[in-house]
Regions:
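Short, surface-exposed secondary-structure boundary micro-motifs
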Residues: 75, 112, 156-157
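Beta-strand-connecting loop/turn residues
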Residues: 55, 112-113, 149
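Mid-length scaffold segments of soluble, non-membrane domains
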Residues: 90-124
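Structural motif
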Residues: 68-70, 105, 150, 156
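Residues that line or immediately flank small-molecule/substrate-binding pockets and catalytic motifs
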Residues: 74, 103, 129
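Beta-strand-rich cores of mature extracytoplasmic or soluble domains
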Residues: 100, 116-127, 132-169
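Protein maturation boundaries and topogenic segments
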Residues: 1-94, 145, 164-169
């Protein structure tokens, strides 16, 4: 008669090692699928600002449309302003925002500081940030049109430093 044996369940000390092997295998599989080359850009991003929900985001190329989350390199003056005011921890950073308006859409700030896209109210525009420092302003009372090849970035929070202050990118 053969003796039955019970399958060995990994101990709590062995589990991190097994997870490490699993993650390494998944990485190698993905790396091989990419032709053995690492991607030229970050694929996984972590957002720690309140302009969008805090957490990890996967960056993949796609044909973007209004409302989609996108990453982009902000213009140098916007990046310098963000760093100088403590919005970003590094002088070189990628922004993560939603596409609030696309080529041909209109946007503007009325005389009362309300921001609109295609005539729809989006939220208020502040003159100062939460620390009382002045924010850049787009001209009030003027209707702007998003140029071809550009978009207007908007965060989910009304306190997001985004296209309400910087215009299109």
């Amino acid at each position: 008669m053969t003796k039955k044996t019970r399958a060995k369940i990994p101990s709590p000390r062995e589990r991190p090692f097994l997870w490490g092997i699993f993650l390494f295998a998944a990485f190698m599989l993905g790396w091989t699928a990419c032709g053995g080359k690492l991607p030229e850009q970050d694929v996984v991003l972590y957002n720690r600002t309140a302009s969008l929900p805090i957490g990890f985001y996967l960056r993949i190329p796609f044909a973007a449309s209004r409302g989609d989350l996108v990453t982009y390199d902000p213009p140098e003056d916007v990046l310098a302003f963000s760093y100088a005011h403590g919005y970003m921890e590094h002088e070189k950073a990628i922004f993560l925002k939603r596409i609030g308006a696309m080529a041909g859409d209109t946007y503007g700030v009325d005389k009362n500081g309300n921001f609109y896209v295609d005539g729809n109210y989006v939220g208020p525009v502040s003159i100062t940030d939460s620390k009382g420092k002045p924010l850049p302003q787009i001209e009030r009372g003027v209707l702007h049109t998003v140029p071809e090849g550009e978009f207007l970035p908007l965060g989910d929070s009304t306190q997001s430093f985004d296209g309400r202050y910087t215009g299109t990118v």
